[in-house]
């Protein structure tokens, strides 16, 4: 198969394997999304949600998020080719054609929606589809190349997984479920701007208006600190609504303190006139993922053990 015009050549085998199609789904990105889905199911059930439902939601959730990743790679294949981090993706390298990728991504989304509708709840299916459309249409097609608010608004796509899990168990969405949505919404800029600071030159070269590219490092670290504060405040509010107890509260305080501490280290480093270095940005980037994972675990354990 000859790579399409304008797409770089590759020394890799021309026949795509199942591993290449798996790479289209962005499995590393999906792991944290799926984690918030499954832990939200335990929170909603206040116990074991059932093996069958866990399997269905896990598979359907992966396929829906994977489908979004596929269409993101299709749309962004021109800029992916020009960025070191993404140049070898199957679509940008020409290993998998746009047509084949679109068929694969579409099939994943249809299967996901059908599985959730039939074996979970219709609301879970709609929430999953909403997340897909937010990521592909709102973020990738509209915001990513046009505004530095891309991560803030488009990041809402990553907030839907816990709603999917909650709706799969209960068939509705209460206020606590929307708090889970809001926590991820305000957490997202902290996580992705820490990454953007490290690869802002690549974003600049391909014309993506990430915050560090448009407004510089100082405003970026200030915004990271602000969103970290929002995240921590939101994380403890469900305690005062009676949705979670002392175990979650203590966990949220400790985890939140560490998130603020790492944000402060990055803020102080940049405001002192230093260039962003991996040794100060990477700890925040990596810890932010651990923070979200453990916060959701704390919520699940608290509601399961303490009722």
UniProtKB/Swiss-Prot annotation:
| The EC number(s) this enzyme carries | 2.5.1.141
Q: Which Pfam families match?
A: UbiA
* Signal sequence bounds: none
Q: Which UniProt keywords apply?
A: Cell membrane, Heme biosynthesis, Membrane, Transferase, Transmembrane, Transmembrane helix
- Annotated compartments: Cell membrane
Catalytic activity as recorded in UniProt: heme b + (2E,6E)-farnesyl diphosphate + H2O = Fe(II)-heme o + diphosphate
Give, as in the UniProt entry, the pathway in which the protein acts.
Porphyrin-containing compound metabolism; heme O biosynthesis; heme O from protoheme: step 1/1
| Membrane topology per record | Multi-pass membrane protein
Transmembrane domains' residue ranges: 29-49, 51-71, 101-120, 124-143, 151-171, 179-199, 218-238, 239-259, 280-300
Note the InterPro entries from the entry.
Protohaem_IX_farnesylTrfase, UbiA_prenyltransferase, UbiA_prenylTrfase_CS, UbiA_sf
Query: Its GO CC terms?
Result: plasma membrane
GO biological process terms held by the UniProt record: heme O biosynthetic process
List, alphabetically, the Gene3D superfamilies matched: UbiA prenyltransferase
Q: Which residues form a coiled coil?
A: none
Give GO MF terms, alphabetically.
protoheme IX farnesyltransferase activity
The Swiss-Prot or TrEMBL record describes its family as follows: Belongs to the UbiA prenyltransferase family. Protoheme IX farnesyltransferase subfamily.
Q: What else is known?
A: Carbon 2 of the heme B porphyrin ring is defined according to the Fischer nomenclature.
| NCBIfam families assigned to the protein according to its UniProt record, in alphabetical order | cyoE_ctaB, PRK04375.1-2
Q: What does this protein do?
A: Converts heme B (protoheme IX) to heme O by substitution of the vinyl group on carbon 2 of heme B porphyrin ring with a hydroxyethyl farnesyl side group.
PANTHER family listed in its UniProt record: 4-HYDROXYBENZOATE SOLANESYLTRANSFERASE (PTHR43448:SF7), PROTOHEME IX FARNESYLTRANSFERASE, MITOCHONDRIAL (PTHR43448)
Protein name, as recorded: Protoheme IX farnesyltransferase
User: Source species, please?
Assistant: Deinococcus geothermalis (strain DSM 11300 / CIP 105573 / AG-3a)
Q: What is the lineage of its organism?
A: Bacteria, Thermotogati, Deinococcota, Deinococci, Deinococcales
